[in-house]
Structures are given as C-alpha cells and as structure tokens.
Amino acid sequence: AADYPFDDMLYGDFQKFPGHWKDGKLYSMMVRCGHLGVSYNKNAISAEEAMSYSCFWKPEVKGKVGHFDWHLPSLGMMSLYDGNGAGLWDLSSGQWKKVQNTTLSLRPQVGGYFDYGGTFNSLKNGEMQAMCGIGDWITGVLEKDGAPVASVVPKEGGIQWTESYCIGKGSEKADIV
C-alpha cells in the first residue's frame, strides 16, 4: 500500500474501500467506479419520471425497455424497486419471490437484452427508450455525442460498481505494475 498514494482519492470513503482491504492490508486497487440506475431517452421519459424505476412500466415505452445482458444489475434494480434498500442482495425466500414476480411483470415492456455494443446502439438510435442495468458509463458517452439520453440514481436507490486491479501473489511481473 505504501507504493500507492491514497490522499488523492475522490472521496475519503474510497481510501479504505471494503473488499479491497483486509486486516489493514491492500489486496486490490480501485481503478474506476460508477452508479447504475435509470437510463432513459429524454424524449420518452421525463427527468421526474426517471426518478423511480416505475418509469420502466410506463405504457408509452412498451417494447422499448432494454436490459443489459448481465442479470445482476437488473435484478438488483428490481429488488430496490421492491423496497429492499441496502439489503437488496440479502433476501428472504419471500423477498426473492417478489423480486422474481416484479421482474417478470416487466416482460411486456422489454424489447431486448443487449451486450455493450447493442446497449450503446439501441439507445443511440432510439430503438430502446429506457435501459435496466446500466448508468452513465454508457449514456455519458452518448450525451456527449448529442443523443437525448441520461442516467439517474432514482429515489429507490442505485447500485455502485467498481473495477479494480490486483497483483496475484507470486506474480513474476509485479515490478512492472
């Protein structure tokens, strides 16, 4: 840890970020992070509507709600919508069943499941008007290019993601990192 300065971290919370440290020892280094919430086309969903995951059920976007192809963020968003808050992953069997039912109730709204390229293109060309499982790591690029899209963390909460580097114990090339 002495090789890596932490005094320039964006937020103090990230200096000893849980999961990267154990017993005072650094095991991985955060490279970038962001938040997942409601990503939407501003011509189809208002900023006010986007402040709740309920906008995914808006009749006007039927068949135009996309899902990023990794299930975890989408299920986490449904769990937040169901009121599970910070316990969104630690569910009883009843809570999990409710998340499943909420997710399945969204099916008529869904227009597709997309990888990175498909997510990017379907929002850019307007094929999808809202997207579960992403955030400004995609919409920020599209906004800079003039697309009428945005991402927000809604009132029910969002999901934080991080990408981190680590050097495996016994690495023969640790000195080049």
Stretch-by-stretch model annotation:
Residues 1-2, 22-25, 141-153:
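Ligand-binding "clamshell"
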Residues 1-111, 115-124:
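Extracytoplasmic ligand-binding site segments that recognize negatively charged/polar headgroups
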Residues 41-42, 68-70, 134-136, 154-155, ...:
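Active-site-proximal beta-strand/loop segments in catalytic clefts of secreted hydrolases
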Residues 61-65, 108-109, 126-129, 146-149, ...:
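Loop/turn elements at helix/coil->beta-strand transitions in domains of secreted/extracellular proteins
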Residues 73, 138-139:
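Surface-exposed, flexible loop/turn segments at secondary-structure boundaries
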Residues 116-117, 133-138:
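Beta->alpha turn/N-cap motifs
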Residues 116-121, 127-128, 160-165:
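Short, flexible active-site loops
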Residues 133, 143-177:
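Extracytoplasmic/periplasmic substrate-recognition and gating elements
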